[in-house]
Regions:
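A short, conserved alpha-helix in the catalytic core of glycosyltransferases
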Residues: 170, 176-195, 199-227
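Short aromatic/hydrophobic "clamp" motif used to bind/position activated sugar donors
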Residues: 87
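Conserved donor NDP-sugar-binding/catalytic core segment of glycosyltransferases
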Residues: 98-132
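Short, flexible, basic/aromatic active-site loop/helix in glycosyltransferases
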Residues: 137-175
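A conserved acidic beta->alpha catalytic loop
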Residues: 24, 38-50
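Glycine-rich, basic loop-to-helix element that forms the pyrophosphate-binding segment
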Residues: 65-82
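Short, well-formed alpha-helical segments that are part of the catalytic scaffolds
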Residues: 14-28
């Protein structure tokens, strides 16, 4: 069978949401074949058993990892099983409420060969647009966003720009980077940059691949003409007080420092195009 795209969902203790996600995804009306890879990093038998219910569907592969291999490595470990022109990375909580979403995303990529990464509008459970667009990060702003520093006059406008609060989320537009909660990545780009960067464990690999897209003369585009639903909960959410309680937030800081060190002398590659 010839596949147009491969969908990858990486799960960590959200198996019921993955089932709901896949059931809505399999109802998408498309004129091409796609395959699905579900990766479980939970190391939890109950979670794995729930995911295995999806084996009754064709073109779905379930991969249960014996240890949490991290976000980028888990995706790269299935590189030999990816087929088609596109890779769709999807978070477990995504829901496909309209049946033409997937087709619209792929058609737009087909018709715009200079796009390397495309992400749809996301609507959370309360009906608000999720802010999935960001500027290439600066550590001092990432810290400021989570503390009182965000309200200081000298930083307030910079934080707003970092969070892209000024953007019109109803407009198709080029952006620095997109959160990888739901993105289409051109397979040619994926192969060129060797997938997601394993310098990071949990965060920043989505920033990195968008950086590399621009470096390799591919555009990163926010596509507002179709939308998916998300639960609106971000694993990296939380203020400074949560830092000492949350291993996830501490990992976010570690990965952010790695990114900043790696790109310390680099200019914004988007400005080249």
């Amino acid at each position: 069978m010839n596949f147009k795209a491969t969908i990858i969902i990486l799960d960590f203790l959200k198996a019921p949401q993955v089932l709901e996600n896949m059931e809505s995804l399999l109802e998408q009306k498309v004129d091409f074949n796609f395959k699905n890879i579900i990766i479980d990093n939970s190391c939890n038998k109950k979670n794995a058993d729930i995911l295995k219910q999806l084996e009754k569907y064709k073109n779905i592969k379930i991969k249960i990892n014996k240890k949490n291999s991290g976000y980028p490595k888990a995706h790269n470990d299935v590189k030999n099983e990816i087929d088609g022109d596109y890779i769709l990375i999807v978070n477990p909580d995504i829901l496909w409420k309209k049946k033409n979403i997937f087709a619209k995303l792929i058609n737009y990529m087909d018709n715009n060969q200079d796009i390397g990464i495309l992400g749809p509008k996301q609507i959370n459970r309360s009906g608000k647009v999720e802010m999935t667009i960001r500027a290439f990060p600066k550590i001092y702003l990432q810290v400021a966003r989570r503390t009182f520093l965000r309200y200081l006059p000298i930083l307030k406008s910079k934080v707003k720009y970092d969070e892209m609060q000024h953007l019109d989320y109803n407009k198709i537009q080029d952006v620095d980077w997109l959160q990888s909660s739901c993105v289409v990545i051109r397979k040619k780009l994926w192969d060129k940059v060797n997938g997601l960067c394993e310098d990071y464990f949990l965060f920043m690999s989505d920033v990195e691949i968008c950086f590399q897209a621009w470096e390799n003369n591919y555009r990163v585009v926010y596509f507002s003409k179709t939308e998916v639903c998300a639960d609106g909960k971000r694993s990296s959410a939380g203020g400074f007080n949560q830092f000492f309680k949350s291993g996830v937030l501490r990992q976010h800081l570690k990965d952010s420092i790695k990114y900043r060190v790696k790109h310390f002398f680099d200019k914004n590659p988007r400005k080249k195009i």
